[in-house]
């Protein structure tokens, strides 16, 4: 028989930099998980993606064991990296902060495809373009 799930914790942690300090410690401590075991495993699994923020979904079972699934970095983080900017525009409809090529949008959409509920790469590209637009990034062909 399968173990009973008692909690699902969703966090966004910088790759390879999970430590018991907040927000990781309190979120997992409440669920009764061995925080250091999670940190070591997460850091080992995400060491090759340094500099990116990785969303993670931790499933905690009745016996306090856990499993976790790492997802692809948020589109906004990938767009900022592609455009070489620190943050998006405060007023995206007035101030444009960067310009990126459509090829780069396709690359990001292909990377995000497993986590998006899009049927085609074109639909995924439209989602990424919408995120870019709301950040004040202009997309050119």
UniProtKB/Swiss-Prot annotation:
Query: Which Gene3D superfamilies does this one have?
Result: Ribosomal protein L11, C-terminal domain, Ribosomal protein L11/L12, N-terminal domain
Which Gene Ontology terms of cellular component type are present?
Answer: cytosolic large ribosomal subunit
Q: Which GO terms describe its biological process?
A: translation
Q: Keyword set for this entry?
A: Methylation, Ribonucleoprotein, Ribosomal protein, RNA-binding, rRNA-binding
The domain of life is Bacteria
A Pfam family annotated for this chain is: Ribosomal_L11_N
Family matches, as InterPro entries: Ribosomal_uL11, Ribosomal_uL11_bac-typ, Ribosomal_uL11_C, Ribosomal_uL11_C_sf, Ribosomal_uL11_CS, Ribosomal_uL11_N, Ribosomal_uL11_N_sf
Q: How does it assemble?
A: Part of the ribosomal stalk of the 50S ribosomal subunit. Interacts with L10 and the large rRNA to form the base of the stalk. L10 forms an elongated spine to which L12 dimers bind in a sequential fashion forming a multimeric L10(L12)X complex.
Source taxonomy = Bacteria, Bacillati, Bacillota, Bacilli, Bacillales
Give the protein's function. Forms part of the ribosomal stalk which helps the ribosome interact with GTP-bound translation factors.
The chain's disulfide connectivity reads: none
Q: How is it modified after translation?
A: One or more lysine residues are methylated.
Q: Which organism is it from?
A: Geobacillus thermodenitrificans (strain NG80-2)
Q: What is this protein called?
A: Large ribosomal subunit protein uL11
Q: Which family does it belong to?
A: Belongs to the universal ribosomal protein uL11 family.
């Amino acid at each position: 028989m399968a173990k009973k799930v008692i909690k699902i914790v969703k966090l966004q942690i910088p790759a390879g930099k999970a430590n018991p300090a907040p927000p990781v410690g309190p979120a997992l401590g409440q669920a009764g998980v061995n925080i250091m075991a999670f940190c070591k495993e997460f850091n080992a699994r995400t060491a090759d993606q340094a500099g990116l923020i990785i969303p993670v979904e931790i499933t905690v079972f009745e016996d306090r064991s856990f499993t976790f699934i790492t997802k692809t970095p948020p589109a906004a983080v990938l767009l900022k990296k592609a455009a070489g900017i620190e943050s998006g525009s405060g007023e995206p409809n007035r101030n444009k902060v960067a310009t990126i090529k459509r090829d780069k949008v396709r690359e990001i959409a292909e990377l995000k495809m497993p986590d998006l509920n899009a049927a085609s790469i074109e639909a995924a590209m439209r989602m990424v373009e919408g995120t870019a637009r709301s950040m004040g990034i202009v997309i050119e062909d």
